[in-house]
């Protein structure tokens, strides 16, 4: 049975789950947390992912990368990307019209694509799952916002490939959450369920009908750039102004102060979901000035009022697209951490005439939960829970080609069930036209210039004929991941041409992906090497200190000459001084130092043991070898306790 997992790759937090024995297990990371911050940090010595990266963000803001999901599959000059760059403490540069993230790592300037950063987070989730399942994990279902377009989906799939995963399927987050909601409610009559998913960076609304294990998405809408981060930004800007007013100083250029303020704002926002008021206390925020202030829930709601209200537009759109009156919605399911905000809950409830939302699923874990169920189905799990489950999802945006006059001619309207295939016949615009340029767009506007160009290709070699005579059949084929293939066939000659829309301009080529896969493996090796180096250092340090402690005990003093004790103590002190001066030494150097110290200490310690001394510490504190035994090699199972920063 392959160990397939479901991964919710979130803007701010990610989560991984596994389905086995008729139930879903949300897998906790090495810190015991069931969600992992989507942060990657680069330092002079190592790369950190998850909690460790987020915890050091204030000390290293320029090299701590987050929100990669807000960049993935977008172009550098996208106005939302430009807006985000203003807030980011790390550097985003333009490379072939694609946003690339620039950081300092081990003293060198490195450039990473958003796919690579996302792949590091996916790799971390993969490791988390492997630690729990005790086996290698290859297959995964990865989720994306329902409103992600073709290039964003393709880029997310590429990130999975770079992380060494086989992405079995890309599924929409609200659909995954609907599975989490409906898995145990199979036998009930048909229900219309509205999923309202407001996360850290994206917002989706989907309306599904659930009946007898069939989950059919009727319509979907959303905003791929609205979430908790935007609420944090409002708080941060508000407090920057307050600090300016009180202290006549502008902290907006100091990245470290901003990061500390943002962390405090995020915490305050969470507190305001359960309290009416909270205080913010940051010591020495800027130029030694302490920042103590407070904020009420009412003020927070006022700061974000327009953002909160804007969440109802997609709800309207979904209901009108699905041609369903709001009174016909049986359940409203809230997903995503931001739906804990009381004002958001109230807006939704009021919109549905006072109907209370369903709170039966965990908003942080529901998406990974549903993805894990889908992963189990795709890998052939035979559980009674999953066997009759069928997912019917939709394409979020209309797809079509440009026809004469820059008109968008739609082949697949939005909210068409996928997978789907649609053909239409077109002809030439001029007499004796030798070829046609087929340009593929997605979007809802009448003119192609207002929509998003996905890709284009040429069908040439059309025999000379009057306009309107040649018949060119264009076929659009959307697969289950929501990714598009387009082909064109000239019926007279049988000439055919096809492309998978892989957004030629922004998409990584096969070679680039392969290069990134090998780089990802190299980074992983470096991470492991650094971990072994730190372990060797800790082992040497604990050995030197344990020697000193042991020699300080009375019973040892009585069994050994003062000169012997002094000799070993001096050697241990020298090692400790060497350690202080050489924190960045290699694993081999630490091992050599340990051998050297052992060669001085072992004969003397052995003599003490033969004379009957036993240390009062734990047995493990007995340094060196036992009588007649050789000194133990510094093994890799040394201290398993780490320092706390």
From Swiss-Prot:
Chain positions covered by the region annotation Disordered: 581-645
Name this protein carries in UniProt: Heat shock protein SSA2
UniProt feature, compositional bias: Low complexity: 611-621
Gene Ontology molecular function: ATP binding; ATP hydrolysis activity; ATP-dependent protein folding chaperone; heat shock protein binding; peptide binding; protein folding chaperone
UniProt cross-references to Gene3D superfamilies, sorted A to Z: 1.20.1270.10, 3.30.30.30, 3.30.420.40, Actin, Chain A, domain 4, Substrate Binding Domain Of DNAk, Chain A, domain 1
Domain comment quoted from the record: The regions defined by residues 128 to 135, 150 to 156 and 333 to 337 correspond to Hst 5-binding epitopes.
CC terms in the record's Gene Ontology section: cell surface; cytoplasm; cytosol; extracellular region; fungal biofilm matrix; fungal-type cell wall; hyphal cell wall; membrane
Induction context: Expression is repressed by treatment with caspofungin.
Subcellular location field: Cytoplasm; Secreted, Cell wall
PANTHER family: HEAT SHOCK PROTEIN 70KDA
SUPFAM superfamilies registered for this protein in UniProt: Actin-like ATPase domain, Heat shock protein 70kD (HSP70), C-terminal subdomain, Heat shock protein 70kD (HSP70), peptide-binding domain
Function: Heat shock protein that may play a role in the transport of polypeptides both across the mitochondrial membranes and into the endoplasmic reticulum.
Family, per entry: Belongs to the heat shock protein 70 family.
Highest taxon in the source lineage: Eukaryota
Chain positions found as N-acetylserine: 2
Subunit and interaction comment: Binds human histatin-5, an antifungal peptide from saliva.
Source organism of the structure: Candida albicans (strain SC5314 / ATCC MYA-2876)
Keywords annotated in UniProt: Acetylation, ATP-binding, Cell wall, Cytoplasm, Nucleotide-binding, Secreted, Stress response
Pfam families: HSP70 (PF00012)
Biological processes per GO annotation: chaperone cofactor-dependent protein refolding; peptide transport; protein refolding; response to toxic substance
PROSITE patterns assigned to the protein according to its UniProt record, in alphabetical order: HSP70_1 (PS00297), HSP70_2 (PS00329), HSP70_3 (PS01036)
